[in-house]
Amino acid sequence: MRTLCSLLLICCLLFSYTTPAVGDLKHLILKAQLTRCYKFGGFCHYNICPGNSRFMSNCHPENLRCCKNIKQF
């Protein structure tokens, strides 16, 4: 019984451990989102885009939004 509990504990600890590769992957995705925003002429802004711009996408999972200026003729 003790061996079974020990094995179960080891498996739980092993599978609950987050590897650094997962953190690096998340960082690369966020960097790609930020690069895409700047590539299409956007800028990152908190909460709501200003009046002279429109929402394009998100820069990060937090409340940063990618906004793009509206050209006025």
Swiss-Prot record:
Q: Which keywords appear in this protein's UniProt record, sorted alphabetically?
A: Antibiotic, Antimicrobial, Defensin, Disulfide bond, Secreted, Signal
**Main location class:** secreted
Name the cystine pairs. 37-66, 44-59, 49-67
Signal sequence residues: 1-23
- Mind telling me which Pfam families this protein's record contains? Defensin_beta
GO annotation, biological process: defense response to bacterium
**Keyword Disulfide bond assigned:** yes
Q: In which tissues is it expressed?
A: Expressed in both adult and neonate brain, and very weakly in kidneys, epididymis, and testis.
- Compartments in which it is found: Secreted
Coiled-coil annotated spans: none
Q: What Gene Ontology cellular-component terms does the record carry?
A: extracellular region
Q: Which family does it belong to?
A: Belongs to the beta-defensin family.
Q: What is this protein's function per UniProt?
A: Has antibacterial activity.
Protein's recorded name: Beta-defensin 10
Q: Which organism is it from?
A: Mus musculus (Mouse)
